[in-house]
């Protein structure tokens, strides 16, 4: 069975959480596949920067992992770190992201495509 791994961040600022909407309509957190010779933290920082243009400070002690089987039958591991914005101007990666929003926690939970 093929194994895929993605890393990203749950970004909190002023009691709001940042969600992205992918061009396929799925809402979630900024994340992406781990590249060769890249750590989980490096992947998370890179993906957040690529997808949202912001810089984050990751709390590596706050790490959440999900494991599931994809529609294609691959084993998928998603690692998310808690992070806060420390710089950059929010803008979306137009090729992959259709929308970015800061939402209160309740709205974010209701918007998430994968719960």
Regions found by a protein language model. Give the residues of each.
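N-terminal strand-loop-strand
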Residues: 1-29
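Unchanged
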Residues: 34-115
